[in-house]
UniProtKB/Swiss-Prot annotation:
Assigned protein family: Belongs to the class B bacterial acid phosphatase family.
Organism: Escherichia coli (strain K12)
Keyword Signal: yes
Alphabetical list of InterPro entries matching this protein: Acid_phosphat_B-like (IPR005519), HAD-like_sf (IPR036412), HAD-SF_ppase_IIIB_AphA (IPR010025), HAD_sf (IPR023214)
Protein name as it appears in the record: Class B acid phosphatase
Length: 237
């Protein structure tokens, strides 16, 4: 009788252990939460466009002036800004107010910047159209600069299309790019920041968003499409 009781107990224990194992196997793991096709297919409801679609929208229109922001729009320039922060103000953003940093950034540190592929495609398209190309940046102006040559060389911009970089600077409470866009009669302006889009709208230009790379040192990342503007797909690189 004792052997029968022990056998029944062993069977019950084995069944309980097996049930626990099945339950554990079928329960979601916090380390492996999984996903589903609905989540994978989910897209933000914003106005996505491609470079080809932008080009098509300009078909039949005469050459015009177009503008680009620089940092995180045509260049991934975080390496220079990272070095500037580490060198001049590791614990704060004060390096951005340091003229020595801007002298270095505008005179050579863009050699460490990576040209963005989306910028290459856009600039090639506008060169084919015969558009005048401007770069309007919020960087502080310096007595000398090599940024214009770096951009012309990296993106193979002919002298007939290229214009010297405009250093609009940064003034609290003021969008310093707006007046420059108006003065140069820029009809399309590409940028990664909210200020780029609002500057274009201030002067009746077409503002088109380029995505800022998620590993940019410029945080927080902006909410692309928040103004209803066009946002270029795959433009983070």
């Amino acid at each position: 009788m004792r052997k029968i009781t022990q056998a029944i107990s062993a069977v019950c224990l084995l069944f309980a252990l097996n049930s626990s194992a099945v339950a554990l196997a079928s329960s979601p793991s916090p380390l492996n939460p999984g996903t589903n096709v609905a989540r994978l297919a989910e897209q933000a409801p914003i106005h996505w466009v491609s470079v080809a679609q932008i080009e098509n929208s300009l078909a039949g229109r005469p050459p015009m002036a177009v503008g680009f922001d620089i940092d995180d729009t045509v260049l991934f320039s975080s390496p220079g800004f990272w070095r500037g922060k580490k060198t001049f103000s590791p614990e704060s953003e004060d390096y951005l107010k340091n003229p020595v940093f801007w002298e270095k950034m505008n005179n050579g540190w863009d050699e460490f910047s990576i040209p963005k592929e989306v910028a290459r495609q856009l600039i090639d398209m506008h060169v084919r159209r015969g558009d005048a190309i401007f770069f309007v940046t919020g960087r502080s102006p310096t007595k000398t600069e090599t940024v214009s040559k770096t951009l012309a060389d990296n993106f193979h911009i002919p002298a007939t299309n290229m214009n010297p970089v405009i250093f609009a600077g940064d003034k609290p409470g003021q969008n310093t790019k707006s007046q420059w866009l108006q003065d140069k009669n820029i009809r399309i302006f590409y940028g990664d920041s909210d200020n780029d889009i609002t500057a274009a709208r201030d002067v009746g230009a077409r503002g088109i968003r380029i995505l800022r790379a998620s590993n940019s040192t410029y945080k927080p990342l902006p909410q692309a499409g928040a103004f209803g503007e066009e946002v270029i797909v795959n433009s983070e690189y």
